[in-house]
């Protein structure tokens, strides 16, 4: 029956093309019509940007590069950002009232918000904490990166600065719980205080190598560490003690640390992850999706590290690569996979079973629904999408879920609210 229907569609489409040519319609019209016909029957989630979310922060606070995002079991949205952290791009001098640490204020605007920010579902800022504290029993990352709240309410933070070879664990209100790994463990024999140097060690069972992000597997009480900006592995840890239980590199092989050089489109697939290994997300069915960002690919494994398959995404993307972060739709089967692409500036929507890209939204720019360095992506219990932006983007955005509907364009552009059009 499906073949008969498909055959009829082909005949109808051919007739439309012939009719269009007879009336002298343009080739571009024909191409657009062909795309619509090809996508007939394809369904995907629909989203609209919420330009009024989140609400303004107090105290003239602003965000720096916003490089971590999670949604907890209360649908509170957590981000971590770099305000004026030493050694990072942070905020530009024109964004800060105090240009020189300890110096005078040059005006009212602005001050860096604390690194960890918690928003409720309505967009109100309800929590803020974090940063370096003199005499603290932990070492705040040189360059914090990634945040997640686990099933017990603990907050986990990584870091991708030079000295960041550890993970931190706090309570929801910022009380220190544990540090796993030692800061500075990746310093090599040539390193000096004046000129530090570092070397990866993806076989280290006690420390990490610039962690990008952690995924929480609540049922197994495990964390999947994307390790990351210096090491080349996924490391699975026990959430109670931070011990590494297992790890793997690309294709499920033991991780190695050779320098692969720059990614070159058209070359055979790299046999190891490039830096950074930017995410390791676990679906409900146990499939582990690893963001091999500069290799423009997702590698998929089972929980033991057995390689299943890989999917390449926009393989002509250079520099920082196309595969930045991954989240899943909120139906039980997690039918759809969402991907942040911070070079091409899209949120891509895939059918998860086939890993076919159905459509994408967003493009480069500063207005609501646009992106500059879209870095992290997460979903809440209602299926809404949240994104954060690094580099000069420096913000958090919300995209309201509007149900499932037909795909009318592969590239949607800005998903502007229907009520505002």
Regions found by a protein language model. Give the residues of each.
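Juxtamembrane low-complexity tails/linkers enriched in Ser/Thr-Pro and polybasic
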Residues: 1-4
């Amino acid at each position: 029956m499906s073949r008969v229907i498909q055959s009829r569609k082909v005949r109808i489409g051919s007739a439309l093309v012939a009719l269009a040519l007879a009336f002298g319609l343009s080739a571009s019209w024909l191409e657009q019509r062909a795309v619509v016909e090809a996508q007939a029957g394809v369904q995907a989630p629909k989203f609209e940007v919420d330009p009024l979310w989140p609400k303004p922060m107090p105290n003239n606070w602003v965000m720096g590069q916003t490089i971590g995002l999670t949604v907890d079991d209360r649908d509170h949205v957590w981000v971590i950002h770099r305000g004026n952290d030493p050694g990072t791009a942070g905020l530009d001098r024109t964004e800060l009232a105090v240009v020189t640490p300890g110096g005078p204020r040059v005006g009212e605007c602005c001050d860096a918000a604390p690194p960890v920010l918690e928003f409720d579902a309505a967009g109100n800022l309800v929590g803020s904490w974090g940063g370096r504290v003199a005499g603290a029993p932990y070492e705040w990352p040189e360059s914090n990166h990634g945040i997640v709240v686990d099933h017990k309410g603990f907050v986990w933070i990584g870091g991708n600065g030079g000295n960041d070879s550890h993970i931190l664990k706090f309570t929801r209100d910022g009380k220190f719980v544990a540090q796993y790994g030692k800061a500075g463990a990746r310093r090599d024999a040539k390193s000096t205080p004046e000129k530090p140097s570092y070397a990866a060690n993806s076989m280290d069972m006690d420390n990490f190598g610039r962690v990008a992000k952690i995924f929480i597997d609540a049922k197994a009480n495990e964390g999947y560490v994307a390790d990351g900006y210096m090491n080349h592995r996924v490391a699975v840890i026990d959430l109670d003690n931070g011990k590494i239980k297992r790890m793997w590199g690309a294709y499920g092989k033991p991780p190695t640390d050779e320098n692969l050089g720059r990614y070159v489109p058209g070359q055979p697939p790299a046999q190891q992850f490039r830096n950074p290994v930017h995410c390791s997300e676990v679906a409900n069915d146990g499939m582990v999706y690893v963001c091999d960002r500069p290799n423009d690919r997702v590698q998929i494994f089972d929980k033991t590290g057995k390689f299943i398959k890989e999917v390449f995404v926009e393989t002509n993307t250079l520099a920082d690569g196309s595969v930045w972060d991954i989240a899943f739709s909120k139906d039980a089967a997690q039918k759809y996979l969402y991907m942040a692409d911070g070079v091409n500036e899209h949120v891509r929507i895939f059918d998860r079973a086939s890993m076919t890209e159905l459509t994408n939204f967003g493009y480069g720019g500063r207005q609501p629904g646009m992106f500059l360095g879209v870095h992290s992506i997460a979903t809440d219990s209602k299926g809404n999408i949240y994104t954060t932006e690094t580099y000069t983007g420096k913000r958090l955005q919300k995209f309201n879920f509007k149900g499932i509907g037909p795909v009318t364009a592969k590239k949607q552009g800005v998903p502007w609210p229907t009520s505002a059009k």
